[in-house]
Amino acid sequence: MGEISITKLLVVAALVVLLFGTKKLRTLGGDLGTAIKGFKKAMNDEDVGVKKDVDGGVQAEKLSHKE
């Protein structure tokens, strides 16, 4: 009863297509793809910024202990 079979998935997919239509689903898929690309680009840009901060940071002076 709780199993998900291929026929159940096909029925759900057919209902989604009937409810939203193919044009709306195509638009939704394009928007989702654009959002994912933007997210990945932002993550890569953030990583590059962090690396620049680490590499280009000011080094601390070495202190010697005087007795």
Curated annotation (Swiss-Prot):
Gene Ontology cellular-component terms listed: TAT protein transport complex
Regarding the membrane, this protein is recorded as: Single-pass membrane protein
| Biological process terms in GO annotation | protein transport by the Tat complex
- Highest rank taxon of the organism: Bacteria
The record's subcellular locations are: Cell inner membrane
Keywords recorded for this protein, A-Z:
Cell inner membrane, Cell membrane, Membrane, Protein transport, Translocation, Transmembrane, Transmembrane helix, Transport
Which InterPro entries does its entry note?
TatA/B/E, TatA/E, TatE
Q: Which GO molecular-function terms appear in the entry?
A: protein transmembrane transporter activity
Query: Where are the bilayer-spanning segments?
Result: 4-21
Indicate whether Protein transport appears among the record's keywords: yes
Entry's Pfam families?
A: TatA_B_E
Q: What is the protein's known function?
A: Part of the twin-arginine translocation (Tat) system that transports large folded proteins containing a characteristic twin-arginine motif in their signal peptide across membranes. TatE shares overlapping functions with TatA.
The family assignment reads: Belongs to the TatA/E family. TatE subfamily.
Please give the name of this protein: Probable Sec-independent protein translocase protein TatE
Please name the source species: Salmonella arizonae (strain ATCC BAA-731 / CDC346-86 / RSK2980)
**What are the leading ranks of the lineage?**
Bacteria, Pseudomonadati, Pseudomonadota, Gammaproteobacteria, Enterobacterales
